[in-house]
């Protein structure tokens, strides 16, 4: 991981306070629209009995919803421990503690320690990681069937907005950076690991992309 994004920087952005806020919103309103788009697509592909690996899943809401929809087990890999307590509370409330394995590590750097799954999800994760090919390649290698990813669209206004955000983070001396990795490179990297695109759905900010393991 580059010097721009240290564990300290991630913990400042993805804090315990942020986790509690996300959990409160999920309990009241359910999934946000981008996460719902992921769930809706996965359901069309068949989720019954499938295993799920989510990298950077935060409070674990997507995992919970897929397990409720029929997935057999889920694996969660988080870069920082700040979401673990709240995620555990949500699992206990849903009665799903024994069906989710949670761990804290840099997935891209320690992917060999993580089991593969039928469905792998990277929701709003690629834009927070400097080494896109390493992260995307590791995720693709772990996807036995489907890889779902979301990342910001490369519009002019997002480039300006995120650029200003990065300047502000630098001025505040926060060790964090937001990346607008080229979507074509993200998809090409996945293709190098045996996956074929099956979905490219653009929202106002986020693109939802899905790739399937080639036959």
Predicted features and spans:
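Conserved class I S-adenosyl-L-methionine
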Residues: 1-44
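Class I SAM-dependent methyltransferase "Motif I" SAM/SAH-binding loop
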Residues: 56-58
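Class I SAM-dependent methyltransferase SAM/SAH-binding core
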Residues: 61, 65-99, 104
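Short conserved loop adjoining the S-adenosyl-L-methionine
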Residues: 109-114
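A short SAM/SAH-binding and catalytic strip from SAM-dependent methyltransferases
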Residues: 119-131
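A short, conserved alpha-helix within the catalytic core of class I
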Residues: 129-139
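Conserved beta-strand signature within the Rossmann-like core of class I S-adenosyl-L-methionine
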Residues: 144-153
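Short alpha-helix
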Residues: 176-194
């Amino acid at each position: 991981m580059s010097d721009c994004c240290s564990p300290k920087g991630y913990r400042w952005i993805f804090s315990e306070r942020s986790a509690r806020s996300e959990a409160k919103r999920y309990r009241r309103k359910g999934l946000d629209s981008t996460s719902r788009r992921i769930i809706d697509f996965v359901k069309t592909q068949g989720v019954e009995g499938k295993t799920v690996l989510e990298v950077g899943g935060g409070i674990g809401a997507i995992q919970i919803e897929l397990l409720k929809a029929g997935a057999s087990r889920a694996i969660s890999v988080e870069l920082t421990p700040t979401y673990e307590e709240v995620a555990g509370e949500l699992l206990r409330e849903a009665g799903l503690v024994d069906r989710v394995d949670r761990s804290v590590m840099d997935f891209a750097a320690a992917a060999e320690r993580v089991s593969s799954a039928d469905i792998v999800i990277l929701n709003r994760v690629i834009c927070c990681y400097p080494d896109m090919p390493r992260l995307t390649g590791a995720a693709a290698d772990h996807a036995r069937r489907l890889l779902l990813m979301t990342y910001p669209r490369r519009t002019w206004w997002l480039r300006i907005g995120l650029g200003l955000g990065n300047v502000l983070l630098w001025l505040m001396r926060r060790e964090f950076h937001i990346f607008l990795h080229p979507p074509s490179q993200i998809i090409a990297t996945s293709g190098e690991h045996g996956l074929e695109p099956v979905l490219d759905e653009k929202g106002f900010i986020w693109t939802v992309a899905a790739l399937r393991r080639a036959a």
